[in-house]
From Swiss-Prot:
Pathway where this protein functions: Porphyrin-containing compound metabolism; protoporphyrin-IX biosynthesis; 5-aminolevulinate from L-glutamyl-tRNA(Glu): step 2/2; Porphyrin-containing compound metabolism; chlorophyll biosynthesis
Region (Disordered): 15-36
Enzyme Commission numbers on file: 5.4.3.8
One Gene Ontology molecular-function label: pyridoxal phosphate binding
One GO cellular component term: chloroplast
NCBIfam families: hemL, PRK00062.1
Protein's UniProt name: Glutamate-1-semialdehyde 2,1-aminomutase, chloroplastic
Catalytic reaction list: (S)-4-amino-5-oxopentanoate = 5-aminolevulinate
Organism from which the protein derives: Oryza sativa subsp. japonica (Rice)
Subunit and partners: Homodimer.
Reported cofactor(s): pyridoxal 5'-phosphate
Entries under Pfam families matching the protein: Aminotran_3 (PF00202)
Length: 478
């Protein structure tokens, strides 16, 4: 997408991000069909059918707190920002999750993004079983790496070469070292509320779990690790210009989520991404899109295809592993040839490119290539967001929100929300009450106001209707 089309897409995204009645952004040419029908059991938490209880979750979680810090292996799972009992899950399938107490939920977390074709997809699972028969990890080259690399390179406009790693954090760490090695500069610029993993240099005014815990950064991060990290408010071109003027010729790269998902759902304002592209080129800095969340979700070629802006380097994760641990960073060939063993910038990983993650990624991307995928995601997600916001308006709650394709979010504030400062005006106490009420109604949302939500090809119109009905019920109650 370029020119007028890109401007139109950006305008649509902004409208959807801040309006009480968002207009769904118009998709670029879609590549995949609507989902196969899936037979599912009815939700079993309706009043009169089954009392909602999480006793087993509580028992297991209490035991976990004696074994793992806070009882979890990622902070947001502990429900610190929403209150109530963290849910311990037993199984997933399609758009549904079941906890250890037998409660069923319509899921809008999707394992934090990877489950775009639905949980435990039969085709992906069958392929994994066949790969498993040959081994779980080689610690050596395998042909599946070539296959997935070719798919990623053909899909993502900025990527001419790619390096696979094991997480989004690793991908951003590799990209950070790479841009510094290539430019010979040390400073980076990131945006308030944008989360690029838990590497030291990025834990400055980060969103996501750091925002949830109310910490501006983290103990244990030395001042030297963040002294070269500059920050600006997202969507603020003038602030970026000022930082470039004050640090002329010193900034290695600008890192950003092209659509913020770790401070809630915040789309770019018209012209913002274009301005970053121009400013980095003028100064000799690189532009890095962190597409760990948006890659293959907003379009087959990610946010950069959707908005028509090509960065120099991109990071990926989540979807390209189909639910298995994975990450990747890639970019122009001349930049990527700095990476060892082709070049002097060292980065390595024992399990990088392992056959199971490559297999899941290959078959997930194959599904996304089918005609109709992104039109379908756009429709169901738009119906969901409009339905929830309409319910909020009818019950007297100040809310705003929006979506792009299969990514969405809403805030308990009138808005508009253009940056992390705006997002923090949301009534997080009310969100907590809403969240706990939705759990009781059989809907699982991200347990933080500062996280985007996700739909999948497994979600049906009936799922959306049930969710909107549940939201209306809870909003009336709170």
């Amino acid at each position: 997408m370029a020119g007028a089309a890109a401007a139109s897409a950006a305008a649509a995204a902004v409208a959807s991000g801040i309006s009480a009645r968002p207009v769904a952004p118009r998709p670029s040419p879609s590549r995949a069909r609507a989902p196969r029908s899936v037979v599912r059991a009815a939700i079993s938490v309706e009043k009169g059918e089954k009392a909602y209880t999480v006793e087993k979750s509580e028992e297991i979680f209490n035991a976990a707190k004696e074994l793992m810090p806070g009882g979890v292996n990622s902070p947001v799972r502990a429900f610190k920002s929403v209150g109530g009992q963290p849910i311990v899950f037993d199984s997933v399938k399609g758009s549904r999750m079941w906890d250890v107490d037998g409660n069923e939920y319509i899921d809008y977390v999707g394992s934090w993004g990877p489950a775009i074709i639905g949980h435990a997809d039969d085709t992906v699972n069958a392929a994994l079983i066949e790969t498993l028969k040959k081994g779980t990890s080689f610690g050596a080259p395998c042909v599946l790496e070539n296959v997935l690399a070719e798919m990623v390179i053909s899909a993502v406009p900025s990527i001419e070469m790619v390096r696979f790693v094991n997480s989004g954090t690793e991908a951003c760490m590799g990209a950070l070292r790479l841009v510094r090695a290539f430019t010979g500069r040390e400073k980076i610029l990131k945006f308030e509320g944008c989360y690029h993993g838990h590497a030291d240099s990025f834990l400055v005014k980060a969103g996501s779990g750091v925002a949830t815990l109310g910490l501006p950064d983290s103990p244990g991060v030395p001042k030297g690790a963040t002294s070269e990290t500059l920050t600006a408010p997202y969507n603020d071109v003038e602030a970026v210009k000022k930082l470039f003027e004050e640090n002329k010729g010193q900034i290695a790269a600008v890192f950003l989520e092209p659509v913020v998902g770790n401070a809630g759902f915040i789309p770019p304002q018209p012209g913002f991404l274009n301005a970053l592209r121009d400013l980095t080129k003028q100064d000799g800095a690189l532009l890095v899109f962190d597409e760990v969340m948006t890659g293959f979700r907003l379009a087959y070629g990610g946010a950069q295809e959707y908005f028509g802006i090509t960065p120099d380097v991109s990071t990926l994760g989540k979807i390209i592993g189909g639910g298995l641990p994975v990450g990747a960073y890639g970019g122009r060939k001349d930049i990527m040839e700095m990476v060892a063993p082709a070049g002097p910038m060292y980065q390595a990983g024992t399990l990088s490119g392992n056959p199971l993650a490559m297999t899941a990624g290959i078959h997930t991307l194959k599904r996304l290539m089918e005609p109709g995928t992104y039109d379908y995601l756009d429709k169901i997600t738009g119906d969901l967001v409009r339905g929830v916001l309409d319910a909020g308006a009818k019950t007297g709650h100040e809310m705003c929100g929006g979506h792009i394709r299969g990514m969405f979010g809403f805030f308990f504030t009138a808005g508009p929300v253009h940056n992390f400062g705006d997002a923090k005006k949301s009534d997080t106490a009310k969100f907590g009450r809403f969240y706990r009420g939705m759990l009781e109604e059989g809907v699982y949302l991200a347990p933080s106001q500062f996280e985007a939500g996700f739909t999948s090809l497994a979600h049906t119109s009936q799922d959306i209707e049930k969710t909107v009905e549940a939201a209306a019920k809870v909003l009336r109650r709170i």
